[in-house]
Amino acid sequence: MAKPNPNKQSVELNRTSLYWGLLLIFVLAVLFSSYIFN
């Protein structure tokens, strides 16, 4: 409780990595669907 900065940093890092993971899954889904329908 005395040092909230490292905990806040780790939470922001996890949120950023989660957003990158969702973006990567979205891009792969678009590429896969375009490959299937072509």
UniProtKB/Swiss-Prot annotation:
InterPro entries recorded: PSII_PsbL, PSII_PsbL_sf
GO BP terms: photosynthesis
The keyword 4Fe-4S appears for this protein: no
Localization, UniProt: Plastid, Chloroplast thylakoid membrane
GO terms for cellular component: chloroplast thylakoid membrane; photosystem II reaction center
Keywords annotated in UniProt: Chloroplast, Membrane, Photosynthesis, Photosystem II, Plastid, Reaction center, Thylakoid, Transmembrane, Transmembrane helix
Annotated membrane topology: Single-pass membrane protein
Keyword Acetylation set for record: no
Pfam families: PsbL
Membrane-crossing residue ranges in chain numbering: 17-37
Role of this protein: One of the components of the core complex of photosystem II (PSII). PSII is a light-driven water:plastoquinone oxidoreductase that uses light energy to abstract electrons from H(2)O, generating O(2) and a proton gradient subsequently used for ATP formation. It consists of a core antenna complex that captures photons, and an electron transfer chain that converts photonic excitation into a charge separation. This subunit is found at the monomer-monomer interface and is required for correct PSII assembly and/or dimerization.
Family: Belongs to the PsbL family.
Subunit structure: PSII is composed of 1 copy each of membrane proteins PsbA, PsbB, PsbC, PsbD, PsbE, PsbF, PsbH, PsbI, PsbJ, PsbK, PsbL, PsbM, PsbT, PsbX, PsbY, PsbZ, Psb30/Ycf12, at least 3 peripheral proteins of the oxygen-evolving complex and a large number of cofactors. It forms dimeric complexes.
Name assigned to this protein: Photosystem II reaction center protein L
Protein's organism: Chlorella vulgaris (Green alga)
Gene: psbL
